[in-house]
């Protein structure tokens, strides 16, 4: 194939134009999806129309250019009119050109703005009379710029009504800004309808004024309907965006990952929302310290995040950011405000504690404990007095016996090593410990790598020797010795030793406790010497060890105490012994009896026992037989022909080792049914009384005689003390129921005659009624009755009372003589009779019935009875304590 060569200049120019055209068309890409917006007929300036998805068309567009200058498109695809646009047609279209300079790609997005008019439905035509409806005057959209510079009054628009064609119309307005607050900001010319504003307006104070226009004739007729006339204030970017806080304070963990949210800043703008005046962009203006840059802020949301993982609190613990916010979507002509943001880096446990040395050495004396022996310092760069800084020490090796304990000093954060159990120089002269340290909070690198890391150090503890005195080990030692060993024999004693020399040289021994004082101890050797006979059977309990407490003392006076347990081996030093001494056998009911024996020795020297009759006399062997029952008992039987009496039966018992003893049993062969019925006289016949028993018997007999003598004397004294019979009246009442003075109570001077035949006689001779005494008798005559009382016999102390009514009574010893009785009663009876005779005419007798019918003034005597006061006599108190023999008479008189 032959390629023609274009050599002419015309051909070359044509080829150049063709290549240029192809190059231009290479930048023109295919059109993206068409976007349609339904909008009103009038579009306000800077009011969003809609949003176009730019990334769906070209994801990496760095150039955005609308084909129509009346519109602008932001980075997020928002479409705004740059001025007020009125759609004359139903549609208006333009394109958004997107370009990517790196990829050398260009695409277009068709945008269509549609305005749909309302279509009225067709109505069926009817044959009606056509009327012309009154057309309403329509307002023209009106607005004014915020903070307008005038000149004022500023013309806004002209309002005209169709009624002006037929009438002379006058215009007026009302509403806020005209005749309402704020007043007179707007007015309208009455004749022309021109609307004016008188002053600048702040949109943030008043964003719209809703006025109402009126058209009326001169006579006040409303030529047209009132017209709403809104006046919108167009926003001006006159307000700076402001942060909500002057200083923000945030915290972020140390070593945070990329993209960790630190906090959010926020700003507000008072300008009209959803306009460029309030589209804010955030940015970081300055960071202190300046490098490296660790933070970024989202331009639209204000969210601050980390952009680096290198954030170390130990290097920088606090950052200061100067935040900037700018309206007009961050364009260079937007208004700017700033704020301060303080970011504090929170501490994380990213620094492990470390020992300052790898090895440590210390020393401690043996046998000391609860003492501090070493302080181990550590370094930690984390924040002081936090869980990331506080150290936690652990003994990893060398403390298997629990000798040591390590704690943390909360002030210095040092490890404090202490000895809690005493160390023994002889056993461990040196101890090596491995100490580990970490923090209370987990190490973040351990968590991330899941590999525990712990700093470690070695500690060598040297144990110092100390004279700790002798040691009694074991605390109990045992020794065996035979019972009844010879006094003065020696046995091994308690052995203590010096832990340093491992022997007992230089130690002295001392006995502290020996319950029976059986042994003595040698001071130097510690050997025990038997000082008394050892008797195992007196120990309680017998099979227990005999414990001796011993003290070992070294040359410096230090001591220890141990126990020597002596096991006393039993020997057959005790013969078996029969328990019974006296036995009762009831014949013929009981044909035998059992006897038993005991041996205090060990069982090896004890049963089985052998029982035998020790007496070889034919009489004993003929009557008694002895048969073995078991190891410790035998049965003693008798012949039926044996007589009932007490027998002395000798029985020999022998243990298994041949040790034997003989005992004579007193066997009472008795004719009874039960042993308790057998008399004990035979049993006690052989009993002899001691001197103390005889003395006790004599004292008992003397005491018995003294008691009997006291009783006899008491009976005699009681009989002598009885004076009168208990009842001289023989329980007979004297009849004295007359209205006149009784003959048994009233004494008369004429009727009371006393004749004394013998005044020298002893005793008390009493009368009841009248009586007489002749030849040693005493006669007493009274008004009524006759009684004779024999003379009181002094020698026999026996008195006889013969009653006039036939009564008879004997009395015992008299208390008074007759002269004493006569001298006592005679003056008083005479005085009584004399007083009665003197007052007989003046004082009525109290034994007669008297009438008291005078109701006048009171009686001078003060009583309706007899003169009781005059009847009272001195010296008659003895009548208040009568003897029992007079009580019956006194009670009878009192009842009356």
Curated annotation (Swiss-Prot):
**Tissue-specificity statement:** Expressed in the basal layers of epidermal stratified epithelia from birth (at protein level).
UniProt note: phenotype after gene disruption:
Knockout is embryonically lethal. Embryos die before compaction is completed at 2.5 dpc. Oocytes and sperm are fully capable of zygote formation. In stratified epithelia conditional knockout mice, 10% of mice develop severe external epidermal blistering which is exacerbated by mild mechanical stress within hours of birth. Affected mice die within a few hours of birth. Intra-epidermal blisters show acantholysis just above the basal cell layer, later stages of acantholysis show lateral separation of basal keratinocytes and at the bottom and roof of the blister half-desmosomes are present.
**Boundaries of every Cadherin domain copy:** 136-243, 244-355, 356-472, 473-580, 581-691
Q: Which PROSITE patterns match?
A: CADHERIN_1 (PS00232), CADHERIN_2 (PS50268)
Which residues bear sugar attachments? 166, 392, 547, 630
> Signal peptide: which range, if any?
1-31
- Please name the GO terms of the biological process aspect recorded for this protein, alphabetically: homophilic cell adhesion via plasma membrane adhesion molecules; in utero embryonic development
Q: Does the keyword Transmembrane helix apply?
A: yes
Which residues make up the pro-peptide?
32-135
Q: What Pfam family is a match, any one?
A: CADH_Y-type_LIR
Q: Which residues lie on this side of the membrane: Extracellular?
A: 136-695
Q: Which residues cross the membrane?
A: 696-716
User: Quaternary arrangement and interactors, per the entry?
Assistant: May form homodimers. Interacts with DSG1; there is evidence to suggest that the interaction promotes cell-cell adhesion of keratinocytes.
Protein name in the entry: Desmocollin-3
To which species is this protein native?
A: Mus musculus (Mouse)
């Amino acid at each position: 194939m032959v390629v023609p060569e274009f050599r002419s200049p015309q051909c070359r120019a044509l080829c150049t134009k063709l290549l240029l055209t192809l190059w231009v068309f290479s930048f023109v890409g295919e059109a993206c999806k068409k976007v349609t917006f339904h909008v009103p007929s009038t579009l306000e300036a800077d009011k969003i129309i809609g949003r176009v998805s730019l990334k769906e068309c070209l994801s990496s567009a760095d150039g955005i250019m609308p084909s129509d200058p009346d519109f602008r498109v932001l980075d997020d695809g928002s479409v705004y009119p740059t001025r007020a646009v009125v759609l004359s047609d139903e549609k208006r279209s333009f394109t958004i050109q997107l370009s990517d300079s790196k990829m050398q790609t260009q695409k277009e997005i068709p945008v269509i703005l549609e305005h749909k008019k309302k279509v009225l439905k067709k109505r069926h035509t009817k044959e009606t009379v056509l009327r012309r409806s009154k057309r309403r005057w329509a307002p023209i959209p009106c607005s004014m710029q915020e903070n307008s510079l005038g000149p004022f009054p500023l013309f806004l628009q002209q309002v005209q009504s169709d009624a002006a064609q037929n009438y002379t119309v006058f215009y007026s307005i009302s509403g806020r800004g005209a005749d309402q607050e704020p007043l007179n900001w707007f007015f309208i010319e009455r004749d022309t309808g021109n609307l004016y504003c008188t002053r600048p307006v702040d949109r943030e104070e008043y964003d719209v004024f809703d006025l109402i226009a009126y058209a009326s004739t001169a006579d006040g007729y409303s030529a047209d309907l009132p017209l709403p006339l809104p006046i919108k204030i167009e926003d001006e970017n006159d307000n700076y965006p402001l942060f909500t806080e002057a200083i923000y304070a945030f915290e972020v963990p140390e070593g945070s990952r990329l993209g960790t949210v630190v906090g959010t800043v926020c700003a507000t703008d008072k300008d009209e929302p959803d306009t460029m005046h309030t589209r804010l962009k955030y940015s970081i203006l300055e960071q202190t310290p300046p490098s490296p840059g660790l933070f970024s802020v989202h331009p639209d949301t204000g969210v601050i995040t980390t952009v680096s993982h290198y954030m170390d609190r130990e290097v920088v613990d606090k950052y200061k950011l100067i935040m900037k916010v700018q309206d007009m979507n961050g364009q260079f002509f937007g208004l700017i405000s700033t704020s301060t943001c303080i970011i504090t880096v929170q501490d994380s446990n990213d620094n492990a504690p470390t020992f300052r040395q790898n090895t440590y050495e210390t020393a401690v004396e043996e046998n000391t404990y609860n003492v501090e022996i070493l302080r181990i310092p550590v370094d930690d760069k984390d924040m002081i007095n936090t869980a990331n800084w506080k150290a936690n020490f652990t003994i990893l090796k060398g403390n298997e016996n629990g000798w040591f304990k390590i704690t943390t000093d909360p002030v210095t954060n040092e490890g404090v090593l202490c000895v809690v159990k005493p160390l023994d120089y002889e056993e461990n002269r040196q101890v090596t410990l491995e100490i580990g340290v970490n923090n209370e909070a987990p190490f973040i690198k351990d968590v991330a790598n899941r590999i525990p890391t712990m700093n470690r150090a070695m500690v060598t503890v040297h144990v110092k020797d100390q004279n700790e005195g002798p040691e009694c080990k074991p605390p109990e030692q045992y020794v065996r010795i035979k019972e009844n060993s010879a006094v003065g024999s020696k046995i091994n004693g308690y052995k203590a030793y010096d832990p340093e020399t491992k022997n007992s040289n230089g130690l002295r021994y001392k006995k502290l406790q020996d319950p029976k004082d059986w042994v003595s101890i040698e001071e130097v050797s510690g050997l025990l010497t038997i000082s008394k006979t050892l008797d195992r059977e007196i120990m309680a309990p017998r099979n227990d060890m005999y414990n001796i407490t011993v003290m070992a003392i070294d040359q410096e006076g230090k001591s220890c105490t141990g126990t020597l347990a002596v096991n006393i081996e039993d020997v057959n030093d005790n013969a078996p012994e029969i328990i019974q001494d006296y036995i009762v056998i009831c014949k013929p009911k009981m044909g035998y009896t059992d006897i038993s024996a005991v041996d205090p020795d060990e069982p090896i020297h004890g049963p089985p026992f052998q029982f035998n009759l020790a007496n070889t006399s034919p009489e004993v062997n003929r009557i008694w037989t002895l048969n073995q029952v078991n190891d410790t008992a035998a049965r003693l039987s008798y012949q039926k022909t044996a007589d009932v009496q007490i027998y002395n039966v000798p029985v020999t018992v022998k243990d298994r080792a041949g040790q034997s003893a003989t005992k004579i049993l007193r066997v009472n062969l008795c004719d009874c049914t039960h042993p308790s019925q057998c008399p004990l006289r035979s049993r006690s016949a052989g009993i002899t009384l001691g001197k103390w028993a005889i003395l006790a018997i004599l004292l008992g007999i003397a005491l018995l005689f003294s008691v009997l003598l006291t009783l006899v004397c008491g009976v005699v004294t009681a009989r002598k003390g009885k004076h009168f019979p208990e009842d001289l009246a023989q329980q007979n009442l004297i009849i004295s129921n007359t209205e006149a003075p009784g003959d048994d109570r009233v004494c008369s001077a004429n009727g009371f005659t006393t004749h004394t035949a013998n005044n020298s006689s002893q005793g008390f001779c009493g009368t009841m009624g009248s009586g007489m005494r002749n030849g040693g008798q005493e006669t007493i005559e009274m008004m009524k009755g006759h009684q004779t009382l024999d003379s009181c016999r002094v020698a026999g102390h026996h008195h006889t009372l013969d009653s006039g009514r036939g009564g008879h009574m004997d009395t015992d010893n008299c208390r008074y003589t007759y002269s004493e009785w006569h001298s006592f009663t005679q003056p008083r009876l005479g005085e009584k009779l004399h007083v009665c005779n003197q007052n007989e005419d003046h004082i009525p007798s109290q034994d007669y019935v008297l009438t008291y019918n005078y109701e006048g003034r009171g009686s001078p005597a003060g009583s309706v009875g007899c003169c009781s006061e005059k009847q009272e006599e001195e010296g008659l108190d003895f009548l208040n304590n009568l003897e029992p023999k007079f009580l019956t008479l006194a009670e009878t008189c009192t009842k009356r």
